[in-house]
UniProtKB/Swiss-Prot annotation:
Functional note: Immunity protein component of a toxin-immunity protein module, which functions as a cellular contact-dependent growth inhibition (CDI) system. CDI modules allow bacteria to communicate with and inhibit the growth of closely related neighboring bacteria in a contact-dependent fashion. Neutralizes the toxic activity of cognate toxin CdiA (C-terminal 301 residue CT fragment) upon expression in E.coli. Does not inhibit toxic activity of CdiA from other strains of B.pseudomallei. Expression of this cdiAIB locus in B.thailandensis confers protection against other bacteria carrying the locus; growth inhibition requires cellular contact.
Matching InterPro entries: CDI_Immunity_Comp (IPR053759), CdiI_Bp1026b-like (IPR033805)
Protein's name in the database: Immunity protein CdiI-2
Gene: cdiI2
Matches recorded under Gene3D superfamilies: 3.30.70.2920
Provenance organism: Burkholderia pseudomallei (strain 1026b)
Lineage: Bacteria, Pseudomonadati, Pseudomonadota, Betaproteobacteria, Burkholderiales
Subunit structure and binding partners: Specifically interacts with the truncated CT fragment of cognate toxin protein CdiA-2, which inhibits CdiA-2 tRNA nuclease activity.
Amino acid sequence: MAIDLFCYLSIDRGAAESDLNKIRSNHSELFEGKFLISPVRDADFSLKEIAAEHGLVAESFFLVSLNDKNSADLIPIVSKILVDGFNGGAILILQDNEYRR
């Protein structure tokens, strides 16, 4: 069973990449095997529509995928780390693009 966190950001791709690199570096114990992070990309029309349904104007987007099934209980912690790590903009995290984290 795949578990993905769909992460929508109100900041541009460059700022998001910078913040995400800091998060990866500060929490390498999570992001070097237990969870995999996709490259940040610009939010396209459909991604912007999904974010708008939840009250966010999305500029960028990335995925966090659970890579180690035994780490599923860490999903709330990973979500908190991401929220805290993006000080420059709002983040919307949807588990499997459906459930708000």
